[in-house]
Amino acid sequence: MYLEKLRSQNPLTICITNDVVKNFTANGLLALGASPAMSEYPEDLEDLLPYTKGLLINTGTLTNETWELYKSALDIAEKYGVPTVLDPVAAGAGAYRKKVTLDLLHHHTISLVRGNAGEIAALIGESIETKGVDSAQIDNVGELALRANQQLGIPVVITGKKDAVAVNHQVRILENGSELMPLVTGTGCLLGAVLAAFIHLADEDSLLDCLEEVLSAYSIAGEMAEQKTSLPGTFQIEFINSLYAIQSEEVEENKKVIHYE
């Protein structure tokens, strides 16, 4: 349902993201049916955000200058009521990154935060082994998502071998995906942009169902791509193709979702 809505609306989605993934992010959004813009100047954002359906802040390329950009973008988005997704890249890997992320969370309106287990744990004062942007897997990702949702007061998406989404203290675990996805730089970053493109389509009561569909579609597209290739280089191409081709019926038939209690 939400895939069709996105494709019919072709929503403008602004992505302030890291330098490594801009091309991949734009192509992924285009394949799904959104309209990406990589605007990085406050005056330009002032012009574009009134027409924008979602904003991604990805802190991968972090400097004092980009920190100021994030804050300016969030201020403008709040003025125009644009929902925002925060992707706190490597928030658990160092004090500076954690400080910036917590500043954004505490002083700006964030609609949803997406990260791996180590990143999300760092935001609520917990510790999970991290190495740069990577984190060790944990046994109970649903419990971590619930704690983060409760403490941060906003929807939380955790991605990894199993994904978890928590909205209003309700949690779902999602078990689709491909082992090749972590071998392609930017699959997590692109997901943050995808969430930003979709989030406006749901109200508070339907957001959990929307996020379940989006996360499932994204991971099932990875499975579809793996059926075409076992090599990471060509997987990236097939993944974009699968995002373009995937239909809601395939998501409904193949999704693996557990309602966490």
Curated annotation (Swiss-Prot):
Catalyzes the phosphorylation of the hydroxyl group of 4-methyl-5-beta-hydroxyethylthiazole (THZ). The keyword Glycoprotein does not apply. It catalyses: 5-(2-hydroxyethyl)-4-methylthiazole + ATP = 4-methyl-5-(2-phosphooxyethyl)-thiazole + ADP + H(+). Pfam families: HK (PF02110). The lineage of its organism: Bacteria, Bacillati, Bacillota, Bacilli, Lactobacillales. GO terms for biological process: thiamine biosynthetic process; thiamine diphosphate biosynthetic process. Its cofactor is Mg(2+). This is Hydroxyethylthiazole kinase. It comes from Streptococcus suis (strain 05ZYH33).
